[in-house]
Curated annotation (Swiss-Prot):
The keyword Oxidoreductase applies. The modification S-8alpha-FAD cysteine is found at C308. SUPFAM superfamilies: FAD-linked reductases, C-terminal domain, FAD/NAD(P)-binding domain. The keyword Flavoprotein applies. One of its GO terms (cellular component) is cytosol. This is N-methyl-L-tryptophan oxidase. It catalyses: N(alpha)-methyl-L-tryptophan + O2 + H2O = L-tryptophan + formaldehyde + H2O2. It comes from Shigella flexneri. Keywords: FAD, Flavoprotein, Oxidoreductase. Its EC number is 1.5.3.-. Catalyzes the oxidative demethylation of N-methyl-L-tryptophan. It comes from the Bacteria. Binds 1 FAD per subunit.
Amino acid sequence: MKYDLIIIGSGSVGAAAGYYATRAGLNVLMTDAHMPPHQHGSHHGDTRLIRHAYGEGEKYVPLVLRAQTLWDELSRHNEDDPIFVRSGVINLGPADSAFLANVAHSAEQWQLNVEKLDAQGIMARWPEIRVPDNYIGLFETDSGFLRSELAIKTWIQLAKEAGCAQLFNCPVTAIRHDDDGVTIETVDGEYQAKKAIVCAGTWVKDLLPELPVQPVRKVFAWYQADGRYSVKNKFPAFTGELPNGDQYYGFPAENDALKIGKHNGGQVIHSADERVPFAEVASDGSEAFPFLRNVLPGIGCCLYGAACTYDNSPDEDFIIDTLPGHDNTLLITGLSGHGFKFASVLGEIAADFAQDQKSDFDLTPFRLSRFQ
């Protein structure tokens, strides 16, 4: 059988692409080296932030606003356990932070609902938070967090129900191109399609070694917290920048555990076995201490943690482009640790590509040619 579309990597973007392409009436094969959702990529750990006033650059705002619409739509499939939780996101940092300046600029340009607070205003609204006098907070009331593993599970189930073929626990070992389209090689045999989407995450270079993507081992952990830090108590998700520039992110507490991670740093790795489990690197358990000690002093000890991987591009902006020389193969990679919130819209973009439809978005900033 020749498919309309083969998806290589069915984690966040791949799961969304499989659903949207199948829903559009295409004959789709989703593949993954493991059984998604799984612990081998970048999507595990239950939750991911979604921010609209984007500190990484205004070019992302149209994408994330469309992503939010799609997340809201997907959440209606799980109303008892919503995929999106509108907790709000407070962005904390020094008043001269470049990241916060970008957040404010994005909010102004796109007329987003963002409230600016000074240090006293932050601590008055959330007494659990402590910040220096020179700090400000930009509170995104319409943002929040996503249930990452639940989202992937939902997409995969919906795609399957719509007739999508799924080949999991089956690594793709090679991609070939010819006049008939794309052929993938797997341990289960060869499969052909008119087009392919490569969204294989951290280990995309195993298939396409020429891509400028660097895997980085990252960790996040859960710390002892009480009901003051919960959504029920209106405690928000957050990003925070320390005076030395280190950047952290976190979520309201659930079941007396608050999840936090450090966005920058990590360990450069070159193979999957180098991503050792949480606590096997000496700094894992204490990585969040500078933020917790200074900003959330009421949080207790580290309960447990996990390791994941970022697929970093050289400039930490996404790569969304066709494979050079092969216009029938779309690459979505280099998401650099801030991609999950965009998974829905990136999946839709992939489905549009498979249908020969022009994207509604300006994807020029994400082309591979910027690295030449």
